């Protein structure tokens, strides 16, 4: 999105991690149902049980949020792989050449195609960013929309967004280091990439700490008995 020259080295790892983690997150609404093997009971289809899903449930929001996020993220990952798939189609032989050529959607690496690709890619990234923010906000509302003391708070949405970016950067650093060691990509994944990710991780750490401090100081200053009981229980 910002056309950073460092994006090409870390972008693919970040995009792949996004898709994998979203697919993993998609399992949790099914797990939270309780009897996961009967998940189809909540689907809106006519049956003799006369049971219908509660569309006001926050878990319903998760279904739509996670589904849209995984679809757009997978398309974003696939779009970034088009030049790589076209390159593979030229390097392999036999049925693999036709397979990769079909996956690359006929990307021929011409100047006009590259110009179109470099124009469309940042636009797609600009679409993914607000979608990611909205998805993590929806997940936070699973907790914030309840009347549970300590959870019913307006700060949960930005708190979850900051935590998602914070943990995502940390996971990306670990994954990139493993890829660098296993596949001997020291010349490609250089110390400057890890240094910049470390700076970004520090910034998000401070932001996450700020949200945590704000949450605790607000509860402490309010002094409501039910909130203070939960507050002190976290320190004992």
What positions do the PLM features span?
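Membrane helical hairpin/interfacial module
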Residues: 1-37
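Charged/polar positions within long, soluble alpha-helices
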Residues: 29, 39, 212-215
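Functional transmembrane-helix hotspots
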Residues: 33-48
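Long, contiguous internal "core" modules enriched in hydrophobic/ aromatic residues
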Residues: 47, 51-236
